[in-house]
Design a protein with these regions (language model features):
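Conserved nucleotide-sugar phosphate-binding/catalytic loop shared by glycosyltransferases and other
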Residues: 4-49, 56
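A nucleotide-sugar donor-handling region in carbohydrate enzymes
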Residues: 11-17, 117-192
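Active-site and donor-binding regions of nucleotide-sugar-utilizing enzymes
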Residues: 36-138
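A donor-sugar binding/catalytic signature common to diverse glycosyltransferases
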Residues: 71-72, 79-82, 94, 120, ...
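Short hydrophobic signal-anchor/transmembrane segments that target glycosyltransferases
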Residues: 192-207
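Catalytic donor nucleotide-activated moiety binding site of glycosyltransferases and closely related
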Residues: 207-243
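Nucleotide-sugar donor-binding patch of glycosyltransferase catalytic domains
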Residues: 271-317
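C-terminal amphipathic helix plus adjacent low-complexity
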Residues: 305, 309-335
Length: 335
């Protein structure tokens, strides 16, 4: 198999850390870049970004002429890229179809991608069954697990000292890794839920260090960022990062006492590291979760109580329903 790589979306945006540089640092040659000009998270700007992605991916496919497109997940950019593949009669292999996230429009995008795809590389048997119920032929459906877990086997994570050097700050006696993304199906895009999370974090002792990553480019992200900056300014117990990159992020996850917020990484990667997760609100509602995941409503008192429970949990040996970290081999075999 010959890899041709198209990079688009937040990977090319300065405010999200220009993470295309990390792709290149890992030794991958980038064949095409499709900048989207993400001016804001307003629906009109995102619609224009999708149009640019459709046009740019179409042009890239015309030049590259691949035999197949491989795409992961449920981002709106991927939906546009998949439409371009359809028009160019390029078969689509889709990773992570059949998963559930009831609180986000990602749910609709993911299922739309399933109907555009020709091969379905699902994370769990439950997801595979859901894809089959959508009418997809059994021979097209393959359970491969979550590719994100492969990196936990392949990366040499930083130890505490090296991580502190890489972060430019010392870990606390207790540490939380916090991420909040917009909840796109809620009227306020999840802003009230984020404010409840901040109130819950406020109630914790100051010796609990909060390591916070900024939200994604979904509608409502700018409002979440503004609330975060207003709350975090001048606080010695808070560190905020646009992007930690894969190595620092997973290394930090392995060192913290709990993962808190509504990111899928708390359900996908954290269980494999033996780290408890406090999943706040409805963004991940319906998604299969390990025993190390505590679901709680977006209410300050409930969040504080859930964090308290998490800090007392022993999650060593928890079974991760998303696989064993050997997804890449299975995917390549299917392709």
């Amino acid at each position: 198999l010959e890899l041709q790589l198209i990079v688009t979306g937040a990977h090319l945006e300065p405010r999200f850390g220009i993470t295309v540089q990390q792709i290149e640092a890992d030794g991958f040659a980038i064949d095409e870049r499709v900048p989207l000009g993400l001016e804001s998270d307003a629906p009109g700007d995102l619609a224009r970004a999708m149009a640019r992605c459709l046009e740019g991916t179409s042009e890239a496919l015309g030049r590259l002429r691949p035999d197949l497109m491989l795409a992961l997940g449920d981002r709106y950019e991927i939906l546009a890229a998949a439409q371009a593949a359809m028009l160019h009669r390029v078969p689509l292999a889709h990773i992570a179809g059949g998963d559930i996230t009831e609180g986000a429009f990602d749910e609709s995008i993911r299922h739309a991608l399933t109907k555009l795809a020709h091969l379905h590389l699902t994370t769990t048997a439950e997801a595979a069954a859901r894809v089959a119920r959508m009418g997809e032929e059994p021979w097209r459906i393959h359970v491969v697990g979550s590719p994100g877990l492969d990196q936990l086997r392949r990366l040499e994570l930083l130890d505490r000292t090296a991580l502190e050097d890489a972060l430019g700050a010392s870990l606390g006696s207790r540490n939380l890794l916090v991420t909040w993304h917009p909840v796109t199906l809620e009227a306020d895009r999840g802003l009230a839920g984020f404010e409840a999370l901040l109130a819950g974090l406020d109630a914790l002792p100051r010796e609990v260090a909060k390591w916070i990553t900024r939200p994604n480019a979904d509608p409502g992200g700018a409002a979440v960022e503004a609330a975060l900056d207003a709350w975090a300014g001048g606080r010695e117990d808070v560190r905020v990062f646009a992007s930690l990159g894969q190595l620092r992020y997973l290394s930090l996850m392995a060192q913290v006492d709990a993962v808190v917020g509504n990111s899928s990484s708390g359900l996908y990667e954290a269980p494999s590291l033996g780290v408890p997760t406090v999943d706040v609100g409805d963004r991940q509602k319906g998604r299969l979760a390990a025993a190390s995941v505590i679901h709680c409503p977006a209410e300050p008192t409930a969040i504080v109580a859930a964090i308290g429970r998490a800090l007392e949990m022993d999650c060593a040996g928890v079974e991760n329903p998303y696989g064993d970290g050997d997804s890449a081999r299975r995917i390549v075999e299917v392709l």
